[in-house]
Amino acid sequence: MALRLSFMGTPDFSVPILHALLDAGHDVVAVYSQPPRPAGRRRLKLIPSPVQNAAEERSIPTFTPQTLKTAEQQAQFAALSVDAAIVVAYGLLLPKAILETPRFGCFNAHASLLPRWRGAAPIQRAIMAGDKETGMMIMKMDEGLDTGSIVLSRSIPITDTTTTDKLSNELSYIGAELMIETLSTLEKGQLKLIPQSKEGITYAAKIKKEETRIDWKKPAEFIHRHIRALSPSPGCWCNMNIGGREERVKILESRLATGTSLEIGRIEPNSLIVHCGQGRIEITTLQRSGGKILDSATFLRGAHISAVF
């Protein structure tokens, strides 16, 4: 039996789950997404979200309200008469009136092993913290911030080469599988809810602009995790002395290098091995401002670098 659903999501991460619902034969009668954002040099062009684009490709009615707190928006949502709302990285808080409207409630796919990393940036924070694993969880939403009871979960390892980009892609497809399984148990009346633990609660705050700049006084391991957590977007950056000129460069990939750190910010000759506060790190993929993404060997053929800061 197909369920009548609304879908709420915004970024690329959400799209595989929307596609999975449609491919499974569920009736997605409406999609909610964040409003189009200004883009371009003069920020005059409005760009729809990836979820809005995906919905319009499948001719699904799409709504992009600034808020769901008004009586008008809540009445519009209630008029959909959905069995359940599926929420994946939507970006708006759902008020009680919205949460209580669907027949079976609202179900959220969250990219962490709750209650660890509740909040906006669970993937990035897990990598930054050096967690050895993370996962995907489906929860039935309540009024709290990612505090709902758990329906299903699956964990995956975080390695020293894991980036946010790679992990997001893997978790989104896991989320799609778990959400389809959740709806199957819901249809059969076999849904089991497990309250979250009251221990081990942490919060994944949004990434701040100042966190994107590399502090070479930090240990190499810390910097390596930071680079992986913010790759490819917004990306870590530093200033480099290139041919006697200071340039801002985005660092997209790195690996830990052997050897003892000497002078902080020093670069080994003919390489991109940087001395950190403790240990050394090798930059392997980077991008000059306005330039192409390059591997270190290609970058070094066109640039002489004497220091980073």
Curated annotation (Swiss-Prot):
Q: Name one GO cellular component term.
A: cytosol
Record-given protein name: Methionyl-tRNA formyltransferase
User: What does the record give as the reaction this protein catalyses?
Assistant: L-methionyl-tRNA(fMet) + (6R)-10-formyltetrahydrofolate = N-formyl-L-methionyl-tRNA(fMet) + (6S)-5,6,7,8-tetrahydrofolate + H(+)
Is Transferase tagged as a keyword? yes
Binding residues for (6S)-5,6,7,8-tetrahydrofolate: 112-115
- Supply the Gene3D superfamilies for this chain: 3.40.50.12230
Q: Name one GO molecular function term.
A: methionyl-tRNA formyltransferase activity
What is this protein's function? Answer: Attaches a formyl group to the free amino group of methionyl-tRNA(fMet). The formyl group appears to play a dual role in the initiator identity of N-formylmethionyl-tRNA by promoting its recognition by IF2 and preventing the misappropriation of this tRNA by the elongation apparatus.
The EC number on file is 2.1.2.9
Q: Name one Pfam family in it.
A: Formyl_trans_N
Entry's family note: Belongs to the Fmt family.
Q: What is the lineage of its organism?
A: Bacteria, Pseudomonadati, Pseudomonadota, Alphaproteobacteria, Hyphomicrobiales
Q: Which InterPro entries match?
A: Fmt (IPR005794), Formyl_trans_C (IPR005793), Formyl_transf_N (IPR002376), Formyl_transf_N_sf (IPR036477), Formyl_transferase-like_C_sf (IPR011034), GART_AS (IPR001555), Met-tRNA-FMT_C (IPR044135), Met-tRNA-FMT_N (IPR041711)
- What cystine pairs are annotated? none
What's in the keyword line of the UniProt record? Protein biosynthesis, Transferase
Against PANTHER family, the record matches this protein to: METHIONYL-TRNA FORMYLTRANSFERASE, METHIONYL-TRNA FORMYLTRANSFERASE, MITOCHONDRIAL
Q: Which domain of life is it from?
A: Bacteria
